[in-house]
């Protein structure tokens, strides 16, 4: 079954064939598109954790897009000792620890060349209500955009990643020797090799700009904070949300919901120094959305960079490119910190 699934992916990846990776299989899987689903309810109650490993599909892989088609884990609970909300059940992907409800969210994970992606589900509550279905898509980039490890000393016996997609062994046995023959250098074989080792056009469209943890490619849509449907956002989160757009465009953000902490307890929105201090102070409230080159649509004189507090619902913000939002939360948590919901639209700049 595994070989058949791999062959289907190789021959017809453009039609979206996906293969399923099992929990705690003990080995990594090297496939272009992978589905991760939760075990059955009976098995969930017996598991303390669930671990997955995904090996790079090719040497050109630089990113993996993770679509959380369904992700519902227990809501964070208050730690009596620290008085902070903490995830009991969670999924850990690099620096991200997610719990609660995150259906429809996505993440981009940036990888160094040859790096294996690891996903770890902690299931301490043994809840039968935990459910997830994730689709992982490996994205191949142009060679100069593939991140190299910080230190990569040469080793004669170091494992080598495939430089050509694994379709070649099949083709070499099926196609005439005039293509894969000894005298085919510079001919059809070289052209085919170049095609197979180049990133797919679909990959280039999916590729997120460097530093983006979420990437929205459509000209309009909605953006919400993690665990927005469940209640509160988590402490100590920092990530960048990017939207595709050209130099001649502008973006509007209509705020449907906005509830972040603020330096003082006064009700209403906060800007800049209300949200972020240039001097790091322990215990200071510092949750914010950072939106560069932005202003409030009905008051163009108001041009903050940091937004926090509450009372912004119904407002519209306008920003020029690059279209990026930085979200940051501090170590403190409160049940009033329910996050944000924005509707964005990219249009021709006036």
Identify the residue ranges that each predicted region occupies.
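Domain-level representation of secreted and single-pass membrane ectodomains enriched
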Residues: 2-350
């Amino acid at each position: 079954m595994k070989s058949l699934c791999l062959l289907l992916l190789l021959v017809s990846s453009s039609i979206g064939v996906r293969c399923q990776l099992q929990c705690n299989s003990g080995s990594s899987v090297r496939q272009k598109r992978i589905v991760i689903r939760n075990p059955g309810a009976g098995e969930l109650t017996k598991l303390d954790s669930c671990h997955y490993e995904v090996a790079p599909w090719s040497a050109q892989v630089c990113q993996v897009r993770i679509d959380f088609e369904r992700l519902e884990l227990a809501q964070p609970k208050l730690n009596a000792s620290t008085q902070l909300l903490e995830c009991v059940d969670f999924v850990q992907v690099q620096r991200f620890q997610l719990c609660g409800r995150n259906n429809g969210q996505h993440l981009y994970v940036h990888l160094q060349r040859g790096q294996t992606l690891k996903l770890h589900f902690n299931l301490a509550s043994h809840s039968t209500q935990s459910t997830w279905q994730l689709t992982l898509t490996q994205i191949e980039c142009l060679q100069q955009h593939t991140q190299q490890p910080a230190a990569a000393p040469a080793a004669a016996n170091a494992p080598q990643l495939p430089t050509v997609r694994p379709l070649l062994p099949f083709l070499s046995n099926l196609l005439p020797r005039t293509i894969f023959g000894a005298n085919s250098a510079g001919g059809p074989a070289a052209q085919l090799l170049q095609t197979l080792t180049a990133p797919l056009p679909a990959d280039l469209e999916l590729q997120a700009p460097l530093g983006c943890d979420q990437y929205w490619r459509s000209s309009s849509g909605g953006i919400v904070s993690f665990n927005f449907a469940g209640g509160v956002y988590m402490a100590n989160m920092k990530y960048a949300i990017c939207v595709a757009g050209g130099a001649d465009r502008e973006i509007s953000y209509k705020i449907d919901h906005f509830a972040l902490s603020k330096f003082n307890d006064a009700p209403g929105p906060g800007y800049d120094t209300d949200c972020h201090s240039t001097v790091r102070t322990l215990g200071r409230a510092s949750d914010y959305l950072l939106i560069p080159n932005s202003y409030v649509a009905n008051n163009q004189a108001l041009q903050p960079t940091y937004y926090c507090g509450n009372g912004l619902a119904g407002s519209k913000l306008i920003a020029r490119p690059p279209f990026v939002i930085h979200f940051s939360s501090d170590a403190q948590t409160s049940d009033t910190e329910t996050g944000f919901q924005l509707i964005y639209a990219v249009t021709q700049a006036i």
